[in-house]
Design a protein with these regions (language model features):
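Extended terminal accessory/targeting regions
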Residues: 1-143
């Protein structure tokens, strides 16, 4: 789980990088964002693996922060699912460009990782996208 310090740092980076969709973070308190954000990778990753991925890809952490908030408020539709994953890629490109000059190879590595991770989410993330939506429907007696 993220600390309050992590949440504040990630929110500031979302602003610094001018990431798309960051306004969704305003729908949560900082305490709620602590539990919503699980880092880069699926919830099924063990903590040590997610920690490793986050350490190796710090530029993509604010991108995943927005992505996790979107998934927590999932509407369960394929259209929104695809839009969230496409936004992950675009935001990853923005973060890479903001953090690394065009002459730095790291910029292109981060951009490629953003593309790959967005594609992984699109290919393998449907059940994780649906889970919060289905839980809300069940809690409201709609299922």
């Amino acid at each position: 789980m993220a600390t309050l310090k992590d949440v504040k740092r990630l929110k500031a980076l979302c602003e610094k990088y001018d990431l798309e969709g960051r306004e969704i973070l305003d729908k949560f308190t900082n305490t709620e964002l602590q539990s919503v954000y699980n880092g880069i990778g699926p919830e099924s990753f063990p903590d040590w693996l997610r920690g490793l991925v986050n350490t190796l890809h710090p530029t993509l952490e604010p991108v995943a922060f927005i992505h996790d908030a979107e998934w927590a408020l999932s509407d369960g539709t394929e259209t929104s699912f695809a839009a969230s994953n496409a936004r992950f890629k675009r935001n990853g490109y923005k973060a890479a460009k903001a953090e690394f000059g065009w002459w730095r190879p790291r910029r292109y590595l981060v951009m490629n990782d953003a593309r790959r991770y967005g594609n992984y989410c699109q290919l393998f993330g449907w059940s994780a996208w649906r889970a919060p939506y289905d839980e809300r429907r069940k809690a409201n007696g709609q299922v």
